[in-house]
Amino acid sequence: MEQLTNNSIIWAAGENSGDYLASRVLPAVAASRPNLKMEGIGGNRMIQDGLDPWFHASELSVRGYLEVIRHLPRILKIRREMMRRTVQLRPAAYIGVDAPDFNLSIEEKVRASGIPVVHMVAPAVWAWRPQRIHQIKRAVDHLLLIFP
C-alpha cells in the first residue's frame, strides 16, 4: 500500500452548519499539529481558520428538488474531484462533516484506498433509511456525535 502523507488533512463541509461545526474543531487540530495542511471543502469560517479551499461550501449548498437537479452536474463533478484528489494526495485523514448524501460515497472510496476516515455528525439511521448503517460501517473509521 502507498504511504500516507503526514502533512495534510482533507475536510469536506458542504453546508453552512457543517462549516460552523468544523470551525469549532479545525483550529484545535491545526494547533496540535502545526505542520498539517488543512484543505478541501469549507465555508468562510473554515477558510478564516486556515482551510485551503479546493471548493467553497456554497457550491454544494442547494435546497429543494429543482435546485438539486439543476446543480447536480456540478455537485457530481465536485464529488469526483474530491475522490480523485484525496486518493492521489494520500492525506493523513479525510474528515467529512455532516452532508451524508455527499460525503458517505466519498468516504467509502477514500477508506477503501487505505486513508483513515472520520465523519462528524452521525447521519440519521433510526427514523428513516436504516439501511444506511451498512454504508456507514464500510465508509467510516471514526464517527463523531454531537448528541449522546
Predicted regions and their residues:
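Phosphate-coordination loops involved in phosphoryl transfer and adenosine-cofactor binding
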Residues: 4-6
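Active-site and donor-binding regions of nucleotide-sugar-utilizing enzymes
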Residues: 8-148
